[in-house]
Amino acid sequence: MTPAENKALRESMGLTLKWLATRWGVTVQSVKRWEGSRTPPPQIAKDMLDLKRKFDADVQRLVENGDEVVEVPRRDRDCTGSEQSAAWARAVAQRAKEQRGLTMEFRDAKGAEKQ
C-alpha cells in the first residue's frame, strides 16, 4: 500500500489520524509519515484493509437492512458501541445513501441539547 493509498483509504472511511494512532499505539506523527513519504509497515497496511472490509460490511448491512431514515451521530460521544467514530458512522451512511437513496439525520445523545 502506497502512502497515497493509505491516506485515501483512511479519509474514505472517516477515520482521523488520532484515532488510528491510538488504535495502533503509535504517535500521530508516525501515521502522518505513512501517509506522506514512508510506506506503512505490513501489519498497518493489513489492519487498514481489515478496517475497509468492516466498513464495506457496515455499508452493505445498512443498504440491506436499514430504514429509509438513518440516524447518525453528530459527535463521537453520541456513538453506539458498534461505531468506530462519528465520522465513520457518517461515512458508512453516506456510502449507503449513494447506493440506496436513504436520508440521514443526526442522532444526539440522550439528554443532550440539539445544536
Task: Please place each PLM-identified region on the residue numbering.
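A short, Lys/Arg-rich alpha-helix, primarily the initiator
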Residues: M1-S12
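Intrinsic-disorder-associated interaction segments
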Residues: T2, I44, L51-K52, S82-S85, ...
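Recognition helix of helix-turn-helix/homeodomain-like DNA-binding domains
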Residues: G25-P40
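Helix-turn-helix DNA-binding elements, focusing on the entry/boundary residues of the two helices
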Residues: N6, L17, V28
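Helix-turn-helix/homeodomain-like alpha-helical modules used for DNA recognition
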Residues: A57-Q115
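DNA major-groove recognition helix of helix-turn-helix/homeodomain DNA-binding modules
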Residues: L17, P40-V59
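Short alpha-helical "recognition helix" segments of helix-turn-helix
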Residues: W19-A21
